[in-house]
Amino acid sequence: MTLLGTALRPAATRVMLLGAGELGKEVAIECQRLGIEVIAVDRYPDAPAMHVAHRSHVINMLDGEALRHVITEEKPHYIVPEIEAIATDTLRELEGEGLNVVPCARATQLTMNREGIRRLAAEELGLPTSTYRFADSEASFHDAVAAVGFPCIVKPVMSSSGKGQSFIRSAEQLAQAWEYAQQGGRAGAGRVIVEGVVKFDFEITLLTVSAVDGVHFCAPVGHRQQDGDYRESWQPQQMSELALKRAQEIARHVVLALGGHGLFGVELFVCGDEVIFSEVSPRPHDTGMVTLISQDLSEFALHVRAFLGMPIGAIRQYGPAASAVILPQLTSQNVTFDDVHAAVGAGVQVRLFGKPEIDGTRRLGVALATGENVEEAVIRAKKAASRVTVKG
């Protein structure tokens, strides 16, 4: 039984978002649909989810004392992390004191960095992964690369959106790759993972929901990456029945091992019928924004339903759909969007995130489209995204 109070009343059900970006904004909107009181927290003011929250706070979420202070002040019933850069030791302490961390503090801590989740998947669960080594100094980084071999990929153990990642083909790139990885970590310089390159036909995100009525799967989401970040995603990604079964088995093992209720974005490589585990996020995934147009319940609605203790039931997928990011490059604290009217139409939508500024390249929106097939949906989404003119 799920009892929900009314926002801004004494019996309100309160949800605190740790991270208030575009994904958190959609989670906040889904909470608002249920009359839930939303508190958005991020490291900078006027973040997207703050626009649709009842209250907001700006703190360094890696500061355990600051995190504990804001949680103690607001007394949320649910703490919902949206990003990795959080003082997860503090979350585990607070969970031990009776607070509800979504999906659970252990999942948040293990997936905060690539080392925790890779060791869980490969060493504890025995799932197929790429070859890998970890390094915490430039000397051990060279040793790790020698063990893995060329070509390989280096990533900070804690980063997002491709920051700090390099594709290494030769020893001449090592010094630059190490320096770039040290600059790109979400918590500053530190450990890196060196991964062998996996031969694959395509990558998928398998949006997996762990809820009171069991584990549920959305149709697989295919996506194209560039510079470590996604550019387009589509659903459903066609794959063999055997590969889909194996993908679902891997995802089920991972989410049950992590524990808790919520939606998980399980990233996998697919080569023929073979499936290799890559990463997992214990929260909605950026490639899953396609579900805003492709499903009866988006990944954000599914996440909220699951952590509130509601059953999920059958997830309806409407048919071929795609998303394409709006990714301008400029510097401005007063961004405007022109020609939006030319982007939208029948079966085509645009979401603008409301980020307060841009300095360089930044994802400021996404175009969503349906089509007769996935290829058509991708073309329509890309065309819509290209028609939006971003000005400073």
Curated annotation (Swiss-Prot):
Gene Ontology biological process terms from the UniProt entry: 'de novo' IMP biosynthetic process
EC number from the UniProt entry: 6.3.1.21
Example of a GO cellular component annotation carried by this entry: cytosol
Keyword Manganese annotated: no
Binding-site residues, N(1)-(5-phospho-beta-D-ribosyl)glycinamide: E22, L23, E82, D286, K355, R362, R363
Any one Gene Ontology molecular-function term assigned to this protein's record: phosphoribosylglycinamide formyltransferase activity
UniProt binding sites for Mg(2+): E267, E279
UniProt cross-references to Gene3D superfamilies, sorted A to Z: 3.40.50.20, ATP-grasp fold, A domain (3.30.1490.20), ATP-grasp fold, B domain (3.30.470.20)
Catalytic activity from the UniProt record: N(1)-(5-phospho-beta-D-ribosyl)glycinamide + formate + ATP = N(2)-formyl-N(1)-(5-phospho-beta-D-ribosyl)glycinamide + ADP + phosphate + H(+)
Transmembrane listed as a keyword: no
Pathway in which the depicted protein is active: Purine metabolism; IMP biosynthesis via de novo pathway; N(2)-formyl-N(1)-(5-phospho-D-ribosyl)glycinamide from N(1)-(5-phospho-D-ribosyl)glycinamide (formate route): step 1/1
Residues holding ATP: R114, K155, S160, S161, G162, K163, G164, Q165, E195, G196, V197, V198, E203
Residue span, ATP-grasp domain: 119-308
Enzyme class: ligase
Keywords: ATP-binding, Ligase, Magnesium, Metal-binding, Nucleotide-binding, Purine biosynthesis
Subunit organization: Homodimer.
UniProt record similarity statement: Belongs to the PurK/PurT family.
Annotated function: Involved in the de novo purine biosynthesis. Catalyzes the transfer of formate to 5-phospho-ribosyl-glycinamide (GAR), producing 5-phospho-ribosyl-N-formylglycinamide (FGAR). Formate is provided by PurU via hydrolysis of 10-formyl-tetrahydrofolate.
Protein's name in the database: Formate-dependent phosphoribosylglycinamide formyltransferase
